[in-house]
Amino acid sequence: MPIGVPKVPFRSPGEEDAVWVDVYNRLHRERLLFLGQEVDSEISNQLVGLMVYLSIEDDTRDLYLFINSPGGWVIPGIAIYDTMQFVPPDVHTICMGLAASMGSFILVGGEITKRLAFPHARVMIHQPASSFYEAPTGEFILEAEELLKLRETLTRVYVQRTGNPLWVISEDMERDVFMSATEAQAHGIVDVVAVENTGDFT
């Protein structure tokens, strides 16, 4: 039986009594954001809205985006990435569990020097795939052209943000490339592998 989203007590400044809010609402108030599902338009719009709102509220405090995602749709993922580059606060990205496909693209989009993976996290990069294999031929050709443009965009970002040469990223994107946290660090996707039990996210 599902338990739903856990609730935690929260006391607003100046209020005597605490109110019960869902745990994510409470964490958002501390500027902690979560991508714990496939990337789609709904979660993309939620994260974009939260990043913009929290930036307006205080543009000097960093944001923290925790990622455990198998990937998902390319355009919603690019929307999250672009927003991370646009908002004034630095966005830390933290990989826990898995950051695959668009999950790894969002991970690499964190502020350089502030991208972290938990010790047992996994990262996977590959090229974008089409979901319209049964479309009429004309539509399929247009889809293929668009996919090529998207692949070029993703490749360019990986090259820029990892420091790897174009040929390395191009080869990596030909197939599914899975990495451990330390391999992702060596590859330039994350900057730091978390040390267990430090209790410090800064």
UniProtKB/Swiss-Prot annotation:
Cellular component GO terms, alphabetical: chloroplast stroma; endopeptidase Clp complex
Cellular compartment(s): Plastid, Chloroplast stroma
Gene Ontology biological process: protein quality control for misfolded or incompletely synthesized proteins
Positions annotated as active site in the UniProt record: S101 (nucleophile), H126
Cross-referenced SUPFAM superfamilies: ClpP/crotonase
Oligomer status and interactors: Component of the chloroplastic Clp protease core complex.
Stated family: Belongs to the peptidase S14 family.
The name this protein goes by in its record: ATP-dependent Clp protease proteolytic subunit
Organism, as annotated: Drimys granadensis
